[in-house]
Regions:
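Central regulatory/effector-binding core of bacterial HTH transcription factors
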Residues: 1-51
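Solvent-exposed, non-membrane alpha-helical residues enriched in polar/charged side chains
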Residues: 12-15, 99, 143, 182, ...
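C-terminal regulatory
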Residues: 32, 36-38, 48-132, 137, ...
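Short amphipathic alpha-helical coupling segments at ligand-binding clamshell hinges
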Residues: 6, 138, 173-187
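Hydrophobic packing within well-folded, soluble alpha/beta domains
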Residues: 14, 23-25, 127, 151, ...
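Residues that form or flank phosphate/diphosphate-binding pockets in enzymes
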Residues: 5-6, 75, 162, 176
Length: 191
């Protein structure tokens, strides 16, 4: 989801400035030997646990409560406690994030684990757009849906998860091209 919803939509800007740089993408679910598999850079979500590599914090994951405008109209949501009364959409890899969100607001959250569960954020986003429920989604994944009005925020409060995004490089020296790409990513993280 990070690559398809944040990185790739911004990539034409980088390639317009650096058309001599070739970029390829591959998905891995676990840390691997970057040098042996000929990777210059990896983007890792999780904790700082990649052996034999140089890890640099890229950004944290901040999530915001959203739903479709129709869902918000159908359910009276004026404050965070109102979200305890509506269907909630969950991401399987972050099963307790709603519970943490409510507890952060000082609310009891026994019902926060109920609702529909999905294994990809793209499905959670589609479910929220389809008015299946309220969702906690990383802000960077829903920039387009928010700007187009297909999703609206339900509370000013956000929650930052315990995991982060890291830029991971082999421990040996990396090329100027990788350095340019890393700097470009850092410059674009807040945009």
């Amino acid at each position: 989801d990070f690559a398809s919803r944040w990185l790739i939509p911004r990539l034409p800007d980088f390639l317009a400035l650096h058309d001599d740089i070739e970029i390829s993408f591959a998905t891995r679910l676990k840390p691997f030997d970057l040098s042996r598999e000929h990777f210059d850079l990896a983007i890792h979500f999780g904790t700082e646990n990649w052996p034999d590599a140089e890890m640099e914090l890229f950004c944290s994951e901040t999530m915001i409560a959203v739903a479709s405008p129709e869902f918000r109209e159908q359910h009276t949501i004026n404050e965070i406690s109102d979200l305890l009364k509506v269907p909630l959409l969950h991401m399987e890899s972050r099963p307790k994030v709603w519970q943490d969100f409510f507890e952060q607001a000082g609310l009891s959250s026994e019902d926060a684990l109920a609702g529909k569960y999905f294994d990809q954020f793209s499905m959670v986003i589609a479910g929220a757009v389809a008015s299946l429920g309220a969702a906690l989604i990383p802000t960077y994944l829903i920039e387009r849906e928010i700007s187009e009005g297909r999703l609206v925020t339900l509370a000013a409060s956000t929650i930052t998860t315990k995991n982060n995004y890291f830029l991971v490089r082999p421990t040996e020296t990396y090329s100027d091209h990788v350095a340019l790409f890393v700097q470009w990513m850092k410059n674009n993280v807040g945009r």
